[in-house]
């Protein structure tokens, strides 16, 4: 969480992710004194006692923190603290939300958090600090649509956000969707509402994951599949060997006795007779990935092929592009979890359940429906080494999987590499930067590419048309935010803007990320701050040996080994007194 002015490595820049700050949140900084952590507000007053071993927005493992902090709106108003191996949560103003009591937890979801205490039982807290229920459970899911799946002993039930419980009496359960959920009792599946009342009697051998577009897939005692509506009426009577779990864009996939697949609409009308070897994706942008006798492609609802796309894996379209993959199976050791099944995580043909209940590492999703903290093992499992590519809705290749690597598509384009060189294409498939660069960093916010040539020199390119903004004559270029860039010439740094205008000569020993329009720079006399025009923001008498970027009008400064806080005029709002400081 620290935002120090230490120089970032190229690897760190490539891997960096940013959690957006909420300007409406109260300013809070973690401070360290005598080896213990607490927190202060924008006036320098202690709001969380300085008595904890660790303190931060998230104390999860580093590779889990991004998902933790992005789990829901308002998550960054909460601060986690740890003492003697147990953790809890406070608000930024210091109100206790969850007492220091748990060993492990879920992420916050729908304003609720699952925690496991020393007794190994799991309970839920709300953001207002109240327990959702006094009951404890052996396993739980995240909340989804106001209900969490809970397990006590060998049976499952539900817990509502208001503390109401649907008693754990079921063999298996699904998540609620639109107020209804499928449950299994005495070997048969039915549908209950949020009070636990059956709205569809348990008469089915199996069901789909959830209601979608008003329909739920059901399997009768003759092993035939169809769909029911919310009242339990068999709108599409069970007559198919298999069906897709859910409808998408008004269509579902069905398989007949010939083991061929076709499409139906929500009223059961066959729009494409069974003809495909498999249906690979749900409908998106009017197209569904299918496997034909001639290979893979994308089909329209009437079964006509829009275009062939003969890749190993097809995915749904998103924002006009579909990911495609080619790869081969290998075996490697990966971290895995125990397979606890309550029925989610299956599909028909090659169309797996696309209704994704995130997340890693807590909660459940496809193949891991119950949150069970702390149980991991390492074992060899089959995996797929794949090469990603992208195509558009006409089948045009935007980024070919023939490249050595194609990175995830961004809002403006796609980074790729081939033969040890990097390039970048826009979302229309036009090469803005050909694969000739030994290093390439993307800055979509400012619309530029930071590129490194064969001579190990860095330059700046426009993301719009690839024209050169800064010449390839620098040892390094770094994106500093707020439309500013640091360029390194010899052993000194200068500042340029996103149009390539040099705002300062190379005068500085180091530069750091800008915060609220002010840029930290280091000279032989220590750190100071520059305005966007490259002028000193304010004079200061003390020598700052380290600083943080500004946030909510304040920045941390280190003087003679101690940290304090200043405002944008350079005035101290908290004198230097602490061993360490992190703006949260």
Predicted regions and their residues:
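Bacterial N-terminal signal peptides
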Residues: 9-17
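Residue-level detector of conserved, function-critical positions
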Residues: 22-584
């Amino acid at each position: 969480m620290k935002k120090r002015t230490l120089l970032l490595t190229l690897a760190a820049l490539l891997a960096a992710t940013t959690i957006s700050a909420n300007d409406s949140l109260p300013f809070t900084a973690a401070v360290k004194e005598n080896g213990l952590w607490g927190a202060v507000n924008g006036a320098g007053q202690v709001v969380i006692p300085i008595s904890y071993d660790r303190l931060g927005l998230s104390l999860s493992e580093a590779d889990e923190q991004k998902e933790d902090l992005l789990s829901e709106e308002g998550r960054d108003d909460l601060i986690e603290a740890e003492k003697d191996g147990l953790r809890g949560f406070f608000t930024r103003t210091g109100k206790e939300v969850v007492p220091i009591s748990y060993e492990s937890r879920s992420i916050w979801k729908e304003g609720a958090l699952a925690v496991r205490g020393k007794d190994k039982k799991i309970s839920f807290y709300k953001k207002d600090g109240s327990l959702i229920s006094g009951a404890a459970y052996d396993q739980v899911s995240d909340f989804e649509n106001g209900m969490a799946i809970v397990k006590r002993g060998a049976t499952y039930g539900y817990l509502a956000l208001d503390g109401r419980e649907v008693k754990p009496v079921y063999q298996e359960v699904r998540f609620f969707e639109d107020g209804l959920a499928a449950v299994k009792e005495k070997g048969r599946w039915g549908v209950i509402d949020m009070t636990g009342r059956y709205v569809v009697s348990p008469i089915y051998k199996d069901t789909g994951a959830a209601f979608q577009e008003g329909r739920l897939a059901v399997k009768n005692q003759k092993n035939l599949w169809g769909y029911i509506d919310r009242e339990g009426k068999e709108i599409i009577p069970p007559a198919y060997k298999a069906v897709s779990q859910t409808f998408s864009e008004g269509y579902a996939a069905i398989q007949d006795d010939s083991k061929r697949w076709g499409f139906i609409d929500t009223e059961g009308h066959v729009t494409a007779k069974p003809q495909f070897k498999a249906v690979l994706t749900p409908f998106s942008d009017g197209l569904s990935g299918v496997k034909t006798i001639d290979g893979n492609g994308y089909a329209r609802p009437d079964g006509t092929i829009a275009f062939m796309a003969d890749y190993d894996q097809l995915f749904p379209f998103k924002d006009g592009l579909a990911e495609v993959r080619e790869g081969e199976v290998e075996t490697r050791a990966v971290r895995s979890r125990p397979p606890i099944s309550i029925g989610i995580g299956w599909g028909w043909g090659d169309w797996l359940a696309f209704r994704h209940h995130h997340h890693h590492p807590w909660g459940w999703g496809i193949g891991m429906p119950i949150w069970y903290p702390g149980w991991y093992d390492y074992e060899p499992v089959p995996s797929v080494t794949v090469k990603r590519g992208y195509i558009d809705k006409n089948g045009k290749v935007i980024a070919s999987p023939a490249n050595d690597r194609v990175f995830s598509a961004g809002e403006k384009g796609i980074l790729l590499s081939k033969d040890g060189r990097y390039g970048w294409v826009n979302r229309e498939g036009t090469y803005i930067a050909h694969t000739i660069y030994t290093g390439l960093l993307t800055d979509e916010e400012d619309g530029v590419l930071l590129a490194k040539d064969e001579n190990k020199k860095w330059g700046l390119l426009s993301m719009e048309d690839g024209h050169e903004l800064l010449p390839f004559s620098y040892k390094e270029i770094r994106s500093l935010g707020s439309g500013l860039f640091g360029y390194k010439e010899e052993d000194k740094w200068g500042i340029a803007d996103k149009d390539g205008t040099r705002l300062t000569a190379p005068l500085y020993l180091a530069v750091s990320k800008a915060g609220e329009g002010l840029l930290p720079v280091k000279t032989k006399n220590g750190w100071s701050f520059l305005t966007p025009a490259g002028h000193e923001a304010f004079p200061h008498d003390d020598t700052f040996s380290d600083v943080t970027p500004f946030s909510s009008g304040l920045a941390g400064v280190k003087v003679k080994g101690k940290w304090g806080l200043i405002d944008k005029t350079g005035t101290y709002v908290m004198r230097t007194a602490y061993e360490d400081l992190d703006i949260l």
